[in-house]
């Protein structure tokens, strides 16, 4: 809530918000965690990544580790092409937009709902699979509503939901309620303490 509020206050015009994000994330180098993640992608250990970040660090890291690896990038800019995606290729889906192409979602109003095509693609991709949540607090409705709306489906996240949090940190009541509801539906659901993104992926 604070994030979206101050974003709106400082940059009330959408194009100004997009330019600010562009300045912050363009030409950044991936950290150790991203390089480790890229190695897992290269070895086909991780198939899909769903991110609220606007940057291209995952793509950059993957290109460093495995320049020959084909990776699909999904955002609102190309969501009409989702039916043509080759499921054999790993995919990174920018849930709030890609700073290079999209109208970004970062104010409270913009964070209320996912684009329909992306919503359906994510939903189908989570059938018979699990989800590890890293570096996300659960403070925007679009993502939380998506998980909450589908958690009753036995096939959705049937391999479990693992919500990571910095050691000795806290999760919101909404996240705790989601974990409890997932367990009630017979799913494996855990809050996992970590020492941060880089340490988690390196370990």
Map each language-model feature to its residues.
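Gly/serine-rich nucleotide phosphate-binding loop at the start of the catalytic core
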Residues: 1-52, 57-58, 64-67
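Active-site glycine-rich loop that binds ribose-phosphate moieties when present
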Residues: 107-122
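A conditional alpha-helix N-cap/helix-loop micro-motif detector
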Residues: 27-31, 111-115, 140
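SIR2/sirtuin-family catalytic core signature
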Residues: 42-47, 64-71, 80-88, 119-203
């Amino acid at each position: 809530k604070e994030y979206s509020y101050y974003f709106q206050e400082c940059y009330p015009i959408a194009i100004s918000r997009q330019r600010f994000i562009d300045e912050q994330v363009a030409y950044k180098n991936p950290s150790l965690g991203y390089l480790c993640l890229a190695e897992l992608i290269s070895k086909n250990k991780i198939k899909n990544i769903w991110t609220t970040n606007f940057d291209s660090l995952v793509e950059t890291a993957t290109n460093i580790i495995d320049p020959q690896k084909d990776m699909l990038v999904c955002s609102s800019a190309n969501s009409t092409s989702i039916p043509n995606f080759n499921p054999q290729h790993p995919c990174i889906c920018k849930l709030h937009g890609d700073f290079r192409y999209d109208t970004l979602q970062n104010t409270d109003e913009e964070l209320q709902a996912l684009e329909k095509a992306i919503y359906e693609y994510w939903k189908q991709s989570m059938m018979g699979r699990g989800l590890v949540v890293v570096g996300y607090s659960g403070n925007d409705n679009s993502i939380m509503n998506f998980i909450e709306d589908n958690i009753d489906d036995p096939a959705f996240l049937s391999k479990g939901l693992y919500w990571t949090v910095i050691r000795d940190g806290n999760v919101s009541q909404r996240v705790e309620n989601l974990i409890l509801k997932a367990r009630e539906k017979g799913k494996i659901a855990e809050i996992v303490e970590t020492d941060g993104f880089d340490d988690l992926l390196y370990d």
